[in-house]
Amino acid sequence: MARTQAEPPASQPDVRAAWLRDQLERANYAYYVLDQPDLPDAEYDRLFRELQQLESDHPDLVTPDSPTQRVGGAVASGFTPVVHDAPMLSLNNGFADDDIVAFDKRVADALGKTTDLAGSVTDPVEYACELKFDGLAISLRYEHGVFVQASTRGDGTTGEDVTENVRTIRSIPLKLKGDRVPAVLDVRGEVLMFKRDFARLNERQRAAEQREFANPRNAAAGSLRQLDPKITAQRPLSFFAYGIGVLDGMPMPDTHSALLDWYEALGLPVNRERAVVYGAQGLLDFFRKVGEKRESLPYDIDGVVYKVNRRDEQDRLGFVSRAPRFALAHKFPAQEALTKLVAIGVQVGRTGAITPVARLEPVFVGGATVTNATLHNEDEVRRKDIRIGDTVIVRRAGDVIPEVVGAVLDRRPADAAEFVMPTECPVCGSKIERLPDEAIARCTGGLFCPAQRKQALWHFAQRRALDIDGLGEKIIDQLVELNLVRTPADLFNLGFATLAELDRFAEKSAQNLLDSLEKAKHTTLARFIYALGIRHVGESTAKDLAKHFGSLDPIMNATIDELLEVNDVGPIVAESIHQFFAEEHNRTVIEQLRAPGKVTWPEGPPAPKAPQGVLAGKTVVLTGTLPNLTRDDAKEMLEAAGAKVAGSVSKKTDYVIAGAEAGSKLAKAEALGIPVLDEDGLHQLLEGNTR
């Protein structure tokens, strides 16, 4: 946004203050409304501080529309009632297509629209269509272009004064743009919270160990109705204008769509997802179009709103009870509903993740009947205090998997039972384990478990694993679904006739796959270890294991302490490796794989023990960037001195060498009381000064 106005000197404080307010409001509009920031943060802060100082030195220069007034006033003892000059009416709702057709017919009949012999309207009604936001309705009052008051809907006649809180919403202008502004303007609109801002707010709530909000609407409503505006100022609220109450000093726009265009010219935020359509079919087309993009919108909506576009026709139609005859809210199917939780089972994912699943009494929600819903993980079940027998809130949004949001505690029966995570996989019977610091429990039968079969086979065939060319996902799907392959070992039992019968698999493709399988029988120990798909064991760790132990049996039988001696193997990785080989089902598949005629690799002696040095038996972790040494240089020097260089910090770590931009490893070392050294300290350590 261009800033062509000349910068006034500091010797003219009144002119300077007005100029600063203008610059800051332009920046706010570009940032919060247009989403096109054109002033660097540092420059904005400098101008803001200068304006604060000017107003402090000259209190008579403070104006209600000053950006400095957004920070909020003193804590209020309560909200003052506000009587609306024009009532804030609610809308009648429609749900089915027939409701919309009936609404259009009522409007057309009342306006005397002409129809043909079949009863169809030949002069269709013109409608303005908008989104129905899932937020909190408010009224903004501007006098001569300056924001003076904000109030909630309340009962439609009397609301609550939330002026100081609304001042903190950056997308709401404190002064309207343009030379011609009305004497009085009541803007009607919605305060809401965008999905990304809601997620960030809940992250902050969790970090501060404060209550999280259930959904963006609750967060917006709770934030707006804070007694302390300073709290509201910390909440990322937004606003969209969509209606009008009172207008004095200027003529009312002829159409609703013209009103919204005028609002944009005044600098008010207006949503762009709107259209002018004709007749019932136009309304239904808009509804379906919005429904298709609903989940991708950055904010929650619960429907769309239809309004007769022409103001004179609105006046002719008037009102019934507390709702306008000229408008209708077309609601989406409810996304949340109540039902009974009858049981909690678990399902096993492709990677072995064990997910608790709620078994529900059937409930219609989000346009479909739901009988199962995810509970995510054991910790979530505990955090939400969900028990078998509870009445629960189920949410289903679009194609998202239904989830249980929470329990209705005042309906909890006396015999409600807590969930207990099973100790064995319900699919294969292998042990279920949960590693420290992980939220997900997992089945340990990676090579054996049918639920993990496709993922295990796909990983086994990868280029960096056994490199079985021609064994893609579609072929794996067929092999598993036809029950031809249960474990990776079964791949080497496949014959030409079996493969040639697969769908869209020609004889040449079958022969090529057999050739690839034959080639894959001759591999390396590192590739074989990587192909097993052990959690947390990547290509590099597989190479380190092969180099350290020399052969497979010592790895399979290693203790956790022995695994921790391997380069870059920390406690979590060691525990994962140990669990994998402790599962008898996995050992059985490995024996099948290395049976005569199957997979082979050259084996050798374990790597020689590192020479005894000044750091023999010590474990060191490197983090951050050292001034003069690369990570590899430092690692080589430490290993030459007999130290083990680990990739993660644990209680068994002896030293942490920290450079610039050290992250979580440094924080964990400090929390555990582990000595932290810089590059100079590293050199002293290598010289034998272990302090």
Swiss-Prot record:
Which cofactor is recorded for it?
A: Mg(2+); Mn(2+)
Q: What Pfam families has UniProt attached to this entry?
A: BRCT, DNA_ligase_aden, DNA_ligase_OB, DNA_ligase_ZBD, HHH_2, HHH_5, Nlig-Ia
Q: Name one GO biological process term.
A: DNA repair
- Which top EC class applies here? ligase
Domain spans labelled BRCT: 610-691
Q: Which key words tag this protein in UniProt?
A: DNA damage, DNA repair, DNA replication, Ligase, Magnesium, Manganese, Metal-binding, NAD, Zinc
GO MF terms listed in the record are:
DNA binding; DNA ligase (NAD+) activity; metal ion binding
SUPFAM superfamilies reported for this sequence: BRCT domain, DNA ligase/mRNA capping enzyme, catalytic domain, Nucleic acid-binding proteins, RuvA domain 2-like
Residues binding NAD(+) are D41, A42, E43, Y44, D45, S90, L91, E130, R153, E190, K307, K331
Q: What is its EC number?
A: 6.5.1.2
User: What's the family?
Assistant: Belongs to the NAD-dependent DNA ligase family. LigA subfamily.
Instruction: List the NCBIfam families hit by this protein, alphabetically.
Output: dnlj (TIGR00575), PRK07956.1 (NF005932)
Q: Which HAMAP family match?
A: DNA_ligase_A (MF_01588)
Query: Any idea what job this protein has?
Result: DNA ligase that catalyzes the formation of phosphodiester linkages between 5'-phosphoryl and 3'-hydroxyl groups in double-stranded DNA using NAD as a coenzyme and as the energy source for the reaction. It is essential for DNA replication and repair of damaged DNA.
- This one is known as DNA ligase
Q: Which organism is it from?
A: Burkholderia multivorans (strain ATCC 17616 / 249)
Q: What is the lineage of its organism?
A: Bacteria, Pseudomonadati, Pseudomonadota, Betaproteobacteria, Burkholderiales
